[in-house]
């Protein structure tokens, strides 16, 4: 029996994780849950999975939840410190890190320091503080298992192979809803259109990132830290059908890929059960029905966010943290209809140009870069 703590239990990844847990009560149990916005959903999760500890967004949500509890009454904490306590709770073997954005960094670090294995859905943790997190994973001898479908695919495609035999890793991208949209029309795109992803069901922030290709850019940086690959050995190819989730090319010219229907329960289950596998409830892949798999180069002129991410990775230091923070502010502004679609990458670019980078060492220094970028991006947006 593996006991789990879930950071972001009421979000898309959290709900999919609990669906896997629900299917395997003999394999998984829930020690603690942290949510951000949906107290009613958390109440249902408490009744079903009976965690000993939960955390909510703020004190008002804490008091509200306290008055709604049934016969099972877990300890209720709130805020960032509450999420960090959920991450480090005694009795949990693994922490599913699925809080959206850089907010997931501190709780994930706390989990690693507490000796927990990590199922990482929060890519921003590695984007913002990849060197720090990688060092902590080694220091505390914990496992860092990818939940992103692309990184799970690479992880699976690397099994049994030597690092020195890798030619490159290839991340696939759906291309988003605007893959065929002319550049001059992109500036008129609204949130309603951008939130319609052609293949995946995800939260709002990651769906917008997928539309700008920033999500793929963040995944490039994540792949660098997960697999110790330089930027020059990480490629991106647009694959609209989202059947091949990513690939590894080896020095002998062979390419190994992982295929499956696009459903996040598959990579989640792989991370939870690793090195074993478990049933997920997703449909079986029928290649005769898919019939055609197509590929194309990403257009970094129409979607400059991907280029900016490669630039940040190559520049290193605090640039990836600044890229991520500015993007979070810009995406929120776009969803609030304060800026246009093409202004998202524009805001990130201007923030990066204004940044004087340094080499961060401590968690506080990474967070300082994050804070600076958020303030600068807000000023640029006005």
UniProtKB/Swiss-Prot annotation:
Keywords: Isoprene biosynthesis, Manganese, Metal-binding, NADP, Oxidoreductase. The keyword Zinc does not apply. Its cofactor is Mg(2+); Mn(2+). Its EC number is 1.1.1.267. GO terms for molecular function: 1-deoxy-D-xylulose-5-phosphate reductoisomerase activity; manganese ion binding; NADPH binding. Mn(2+) binds at residues 148, 150, 219. InterPro entries: DXP_reductoisomerase, DXP_reductoisomerase_C, DXP_reductoisomerase_N, DXPR_C, DXPR_C_sf, NAD(P)-bd_dom_sf. It holds the Pfam family DXP_redisom_C. It catalyses: 2-C-methyl-D-erythritol 4-phosphate + NADP(+) = 1-deoxy-D-xylulose 5-phosphate + NADPH + H(+). 1-deoxy-D-xylulose 5-phosphate binds at residues 123, 149-150, 174, 197, 210, 215-216, 219. Pathway: Isoprenoid biosynthesis; isopentenyl diphosphate biosynthesis via DXP pathway; isopentenyl diphosphate from 1-deoxy-D-xylulose 5-phosphate: step 1/6. One of its GO terms (biological process) is isopentenyl diphosphate biosynthetic process, methylerythritol 4-phosphate pathway involved in terpenoid biosynthetic process. NADPH binds at residues 10-13, 36, 122, 124, 203. Belongs to the DXR family. Catalyzes the NADPH-dependent rearrangement and reduction of 1-deoxy-D-xylulose-5-phosphate (DXP) to 2-C-methyl-D-erythritol 4-phosphate (MEP). This is 1-deoxy-D-xylulose 5-phosphate reductoisomerase. It comes from Chlorobaculum tepidum (strain ATCC 49652 / DSM 12025 / NBRC 103806 / TLS) (Chlorobium tepidum).
